[in-house]
A protein has these predicted regions:
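Extracytoplasmic low-complexity, Pro/Thr/Ser/Ala/Gly-rich segments
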Residues: 42-128, 219-270, 342-345, 354-355, ...
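Hydrophobic membrane-insertion alpha-helices, especially the h-region
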Residues: 14-45
Length: 370
């Protein structure tokens, strides 16, 4: 038997050495590939996208609708995280759950707060509170079958919205008969235009739908939102020309459009020089018992009395088809002390006109007034 090595001529390469070299090259290439792939994954932006998507899936149990958030905020990336609820002295939204979605640098975001109906004081506070001390707040209905309202945050072009979702499977539970979803936005671009307002409203109601499923609230959804009413918070309507929430009131006013499902309505009665004399509001559903917890109403508004007049606050109520009585209230605003209405007759008349029309619109009866 002839040794293989004897058949190889002097100077021929060693086959074993060649195989070893190829093996080393393959190992080196594999090591380079193992090291390079994570780098490519990271620097290509795929890693950031993966992290963003993973965070959004865990935020508010994945209920936040992010399909239009980038356009809404004016950012290229969004990431989400849950937030601990504020348990301070003032009622704040988010006692059930709270989260935020926005740019990783924190310069633009939307916060989502979830509350059961028994904690409605927090959502009302975050929506604006409607304290008797300020000439602010104009709830605009989302319409399209949604029990929700939209407003601009005072002094900004940012938006806030709240939606009430009655839970058909929780009707007998006084604390959680409905789910309240409150969304606040802070963008790098204005949210004041029609397209942005509609985008914000769509994100709010879609998030509310998702949250109702995640928190076991069997609710009926409204329709698709293509547009929402324009903001009229600073639009003065001449005397006798009111067509919305102030219709029937003969003075100059500021008002919003009406909707039979709006849980909050506002009408501002103006003096001759355009200064607000008093704000008349309607509250339905869980917001009725939430108002006395707002700053300025403690010891003044008695929710157990169907009607009253105390310390410059007039209120009445009506029995509604669902969720008890509605509240109709008029508060005198700063700068209104010099108005000519010594007996309050004009204010009582305006409250009566407002309450009669609002209660009829919502199908309520047994209206009682001071």
């Amino acid at each position: 038997m002839v040794d293989v090595t004897e058949q190889r001529r002097i100077g021929d390469p060693d086959p074993g050495a060649a195989r070893l070299k190829r093996k080393r090259l393959l190992i080196a290439a594999g090591v380079v590939l193992v090291l390079a792939v994570p780098g490519i994954f990271y620097f290509s932006g795929a890693y950031d996208s993966w992290q963003d998507n993973r965070s959004l899936a865990d935020t508010c149990r994945g209920s936040v609708d992010t399909s239009e958030v980038k356009e809404l905020l004016g950012v290229d990336r969004v990431r989400g995280h849950d937030i601990e609820a504020d348990h301070g002295s003032s009622p704040r939204a988010g006692q059930l759950h709270k989260c935020s979605v926005g740019a990783p640098d924190g310069n633009a975001s939307v916060s989502v707060s979830l509350d059961w109906s028994g904690d409605a004081a927090g959502p009302l506070h975050d929506f604006g509170g409607f304290t008797p001390y300020g000439d602010v707040g104009m709830a605009t209905p989302l319409k399209h079958g949604w029990e929700g309202v939209l407003d601009e945050v005072s002094g900004t072009r940012n938006l806030v919205a709240t939606v009430n979702l009655p839970c058909e499977n929780r009707r007998t539970d006084a604390r959680s008969s409905s789910l309240l979803v409150t969304v606040q936005g802070m963008g790098t671009r204005s949210m004041g235009g029609a397209a942005q307002r509609a985008r914000f409203a769509r994100m709010t109601v879609k998030t509310a739908q998702n949250a109702s499923k995640a928190w076991d609230c069997a609710s009926r959804a409204g329709g698709e939102i293509e547009r929402v009413p324009d903001s009229t918070a600073h639009t003065q309507v001449p005397q006798g020309e009111a067509r919305g929430t102030c219709v029937g009131i003969k003075t100059a006013v500021r008002e919003s459009v009406t909707d039979a499902k709006a849980p909050i309505e506002n009408c501002y009665v103006l003096a001759d020089r355009g200064v607000s004399q008093y704000r008349i509001s309607a509250f339905y559903g869980p917001f009725v018992r939430a108002l006395p917890a707002q700053r300025g109403y403690s010891g003044v508004l008695d929710p157990e009395k169907p009607a009253g007049n105390k310390d410059g606050v007039l209120w009445g109520s009506a029995k509604c088809p669902s969720e008890g009585r509605a509240l109709y209230i008029s508060t005198r605003l700063p700068g209104a002390a010099d108005r000519f209405d010594p007996d309050g007759d004009a204010e009582k008349s305006a409250l009566k006109t407002f309450a009669m029309r609002s209660s009829k619109r919502h199908g309520c009866e047994d209206l009682q007034l001071p």
